[in-house]
Amino acid sequence: MGKGVRVLNSSEGVKGTIFFTQEGNGTTTVTGTVSGLKPGLHGFHVHALGDTTNGCMSTGPHFNPEGKTHGAPEDANRHAGDLGNITVGDDGTATFTITDSQIPLDGPNSIVGRAVVVHAEPDDLGKGGHELSLTTGNAGGRVACGIIGLQG
């Protein structure tokens, strides 16, 4: 079993802890709590780079080892890092569990050392018709991020 963890912090007061767990070669389960967000849906993605030297902007595009267009987590044609949206309650907190088969913690497409990013707006899942729908889900700015590391 592999385990990863990421603690999120941002200059905008967003903070949280996200855990990644993979059983054998199976799917990865992502569980977390993030607070300090406006209520509603927020895009949630694994980005290609584990670089936060220029804040969340340094994390690069969505993790996309197969060169596909942006989509929903259940779509066959999607970036590996497309994890959809997290739902934030009226108290500004999101508590979530996501299970996904395209974000392993080991092997050539491992997400360890990459970044997880929470966006300012909802991800349209590639179906919004906006010029950014098929690249970013038109999810707006990056409000919090952190590098995914191994956990003992």
UniProtKB/Swiss-Prot annotation:
SUPFAM superfamilies: Cu,Zn superoxide dismutase-like. Keywords: Antioxidant, Copper, Cytoplasm, Disulfide bond, Metal-binding, Oxidoreductase, Zinc. Pfam families: Sod_Cu. Binds 1 copper ion per subunit. Transmembrane segments: none annotated. Zn(2+) binds at residues 62, 70, 79, 82. Homodimer. PANTHER family: SUPEROXIDE DISMUTASE CU-ZN -RELATED. This is Superoxide dismutase [Cu-Zn] 1. It comes from Brassica juncea.
